């Protein structure tokens, strides 16, 4: 069993390993047909598995160990990225990356949450859980972008805001609440993209936007499936049941009017074709940025207010 892949991906991985083993043979004259048949079989199996994923399986894909993180996208989506540091109050939180960049030659302010892949990186980025100084840094950069009329682009990928004692002492809840308040009236366009995991207030604190997009196999929820299962069922192993109830996938959120656009993923998920995922993200951002720039600021703010006020409305 390949530990870099999820359990439901294992049949696909086994076929790919067979294809790779055949590809390593120097004289391929006698195995060309066999390789071709295996590739067709692998592609068909991938389509079959990914056409009927459960909400829990999508939740697992959103946290896939090989899924791209914020820093994986920056150099491919943006040009001339210059990182800015610190909240000018306490310190610099590495879990939130921010700075000035260009998207299709247009100056933008970029802010994104970063997790980390190795043990050292996970500690550096605090497993993608921002502290108050991270959210205050984000707000400082947002205010700067408003001053210079630069659109804001945020990448959301966090299990949630850091719940440590120090973070609470430094005003975690206040920092999140202030971001929500300020972002609702920032006089500049805001585009947010959930690239992986959107966890509760930790995600919302950089997610109040004019356009909210999600990758197809990302999630956005008030609580993790495991946390929900622990509360509702007193059993974290029932996370699959909780995931179904939370309606946390991009399809459910789009249907309920909580997000605007779903960005498609390569067959098998982002980790199967990272290069294609970067292209899809960049194209979606450029398209939305070009459209949203056409709106007068007054209209933009009015639309944003209406969007926020419509959250939670439902029909019997």
Swiss-Prot record:
Pathway: Lipid metabolism; malonyl-CoA biosynthesis; malonyl-CoA from acetyl-CoA: step 1/1. GO terms for cellular component: acetyl-CoA carboxylase complex. It comes from the Bacteria. Residues 24-291 form the CoA carboxyltransferase C-terminal domain. It is found in: Cytoplasm. InterPro entries: Acetyl_CoA_COase_a_su, ClpP/crotonase-like_dom_sf, COA_CT_C. Pfam families: ACCA. The keyword Membrane does not apply. GO terms for biological process: fatty acid biosynthetic process; malonyl-CoA biosynthetic process. Disulfide bonds: none annotated. Keywords: ATP-binding, Cytoplasm, Fatty acid biosynthesis, Fatty acid metabolism, Lipid biosynthesis, Lipid metabolism, Nucleotide-binding, Transferase. GO terms for molecular function: acetyl-CoA carboxylase activity; ATP binding; carboxyl- or carbamoyltransferase activity. Its EC number is 2.1.3.15. It catalyses: N(6)-carboxybiotinyl-L-lysyl-[protein] + acetyl-CoA = N(6)-biotinyl-L-lysyl-[protein] + malonyl-CoA. It is an enzyme of class 2 (transferase). Belongs to the AccA family. HAMAP family: AcetylCoA_CT_alpha. Component of the acetyl coenzyme A carboxylase (ACC) complex. First, biotin carboxylase catalyzes the carboxylation of biotin on its carrier protein (BCCP) and then the CO(2) group is transferred by the carboxyltransferase to acetyl-CoA to form malonyl-CoA. Acetyl-CoA carboxylase is a heterohexamer composed of biotin carboxyl carrier protein (AccB), biotin carboxylase (AccC) and two subunits each of ACCase subunit alpha (AccA) and ACCase subunit beta (AccD). This is Acetyl-coenzyme A carboxylase carboxyl transferase subunit alpha. The gene is accA.
């Amino acid at each position: 069993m390949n530990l870099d892949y999820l359990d439901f991906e294992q049949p696909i991985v086994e076929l790919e390993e067979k294809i790779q083993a055949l590809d390593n043979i120097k004289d391929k004259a006698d195995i060309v047909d066999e390789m071709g048949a295996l590739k067709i079989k692998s592609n068909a199996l991938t389509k079959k598995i990914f056409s009927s994923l459960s909400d829990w399986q999508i939740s697992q894909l959103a946290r896939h160990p090989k899924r791209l993180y914020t820093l994986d996208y920056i150099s491919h989506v943006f040009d001339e990225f210059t990182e800015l540091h610190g909240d000018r109050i306490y310190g610099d939180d590495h879990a939130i990356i921010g700075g000035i960049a260009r998207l299709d030659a247009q100056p933008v302010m970029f802010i994104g949450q970063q997790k980390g892949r190795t043990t050292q990186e996970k500690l550096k980025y605090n497993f993608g859980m921002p502290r108050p100084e991270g959210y205050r840094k984000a707000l400082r950069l947002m205010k700067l972008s408003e001053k210079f009329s630069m659109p804001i682009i945020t990448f959301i990928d966090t299990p949630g805001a850091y719940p440590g004692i120090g973070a609470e002492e430094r005003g975690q809840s206040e920092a999140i609440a202030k971001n929500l308040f300020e972002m609702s009236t920032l006089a500049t366009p805001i585009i947010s993209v959930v690239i992986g995991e959107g966890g509760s207030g930790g995600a919302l604190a950089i997610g109040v936007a004019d356009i909210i997009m999600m990758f197809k196999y990302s999630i956005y929820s008030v609580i993790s499936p495991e946390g929900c299962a622990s509360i509702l069922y007193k059993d974290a192993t029932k996370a699959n049941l909780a995931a179904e109830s939370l309606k946390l996938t991009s399809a459910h959120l789009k249907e309920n009017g909580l997000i605007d656009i779903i960005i498609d993923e390569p067959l098998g998920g982002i980790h199967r074709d990272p290069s294609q995922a970067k292209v899809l993200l960049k194209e979606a951002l450029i398209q939305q940025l070009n459209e949203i720039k056409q709106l007068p600021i007054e209209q933009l703010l009015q639309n944003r207010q209406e969007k926020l006020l419509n959250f939670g409305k439902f029909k019997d």
